[in-house]
């Protein structure tokens, strides 16, 4: 039995030895981060020519977030039932400016926020799709686009990314204090370079 465990350990070590960690390219808020030919998971991804600048960030309650964008659940519809595990309690909103520097249109080139995370050493926060649609005024018929888009050549657009967490949730509990104290990174790509922006509250 011990020999099997030892052999398994050696096998895992040999496999991992051949995996190179991506080079981390660090940006700060206010810096324009060009994505280049880097990707998240799929070689068919094409974000070349696009750049992202994190302009501002803030933490607020779910209720304050809805109030900010004029959404009334009694009139406009309930977004999350009380027992929904994805119901946010707190929002870490990051405002970004996206630019397309390409001079010609390319239908295969664009950005998807489905892979965007705010990452720390021991937790990560995801974008809430319903809150993203509200903040960015996405029409209902376009909400199946899964937060993917492309910009016209040589154009730019601002977006609000609502990363959510729920301190009171037994499943995904992370405290507000933990989030505020963490070294948070907005990851823009994973391979071959991990390009990321350090996020700090500005308000």
Segments from the language model and where they lie:
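Conserved functional micro-motifs across diverse proteins
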Residues: 1-203
